[in-house]
């Protein structure tokens, strides 16, 4: 019986490792409100000084780093303010920041992210925006870009600035 448990457990571990390796190479992106793991695409290594191409993009993918080393990815909105790219996280049903958004907890712990815009991957660092004047201005650009969007109010909206 002990030998059967060891063999069965070993097979389970091998299957799990093979599954994770497969996901690592083929990726598993977020879909229809569900989260994903690794993002795939062409990595852009040159600095980006003009993010204006994102104005035509509704949603982007954000891959964050978890404490257990398996990436966590989500889709989110983005906008530009003063030539900088910003990411958006709204707490529509309330909840405490960052506890109700796993990706928010991840980027506060480790701000390195991968952004997928189209088929391109951008490895960047983000910074949580806390300055009220900047938050108000960025929030206004979100409202102008996403005209169908109904804001839950600035107090439940959180923004992250993408650093160069």
Q: How does the language model describe each region?
A:
Residues 13, 62, 87, 115, ...:
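Generic structural hydrophobic/aromatic packing signal, biased to beta-strands
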Residues 57-95, 125:
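Short beta-strand segments
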